[in-house]
Amino acid sequence: MFRGNFETSIDAKGRTSLPAKFREVLVDSFGDERFFMTNSNPVRLGDGGYSSGLVIYPYNEWLALEEKLKVGTGLGLSSAELASVKRRIVAPAVECVADKLGRILVPPHLRKSACLEREILFVGMLNKAEIWSQAEWEKVFRQDIENFPIDSPVLAELGL
């Protein structure tokens, strides 16, 4: 499973290094070094704006998601909502594999949608990982703390 946060940088051409730990997880836990990268679901911020990062799906996890979206039944979505999800998540998706040095290329359309410029953060989310600009991550993380304070019943229910 993907765990932890890893700070790194991305250059002007969109090259960055996939954390070694995440490369290990792809192969050891998911059996494939390939993955898909796409837009994450936007997070609504308290000021009414939105923040968005990218999400990395292990290859087989992505194929399972595509199958659900292809069938479309049982998801509780209207055909318009399903089409919207496909446009936001499936259409911009790219298949990736790190090179021998662990580098990946984040294409321009994904860098733009996630506001990735220089300092970025890889975030482990168990069966997937996220990529955030440092600035956007700080906004989202601050909101998470406000939404789930230390005495939150949600956290207590999870035993945290």
Swiss-Prot record:
One of its GO terms (biological process) is negative regulation of DNA-templated transcription initiation. Keywords: Cytoplasm, DNA-binding, Repeat, Transcription, Transcription regulation. One of its GO terms (molecular function) is DNA-binding transcription factor activity. Gene3D superfamilies: Transcriptional regulator MraZ domain. The keyword DNA-binding applies. It is found in: Cytoplasm, Nucleoid. Forms oligomers. HAMAP family: MraZ. This is Transcriptional regulator MraZ. It comes from Geotalea daltonii (strain DSM 22248 / JCM 15807 / FRC-32). The lineage of its organism: Bacteria, Pseudomonadati, Thermodesulfobacteriota, Desulfuromonadia, Geobacterales.
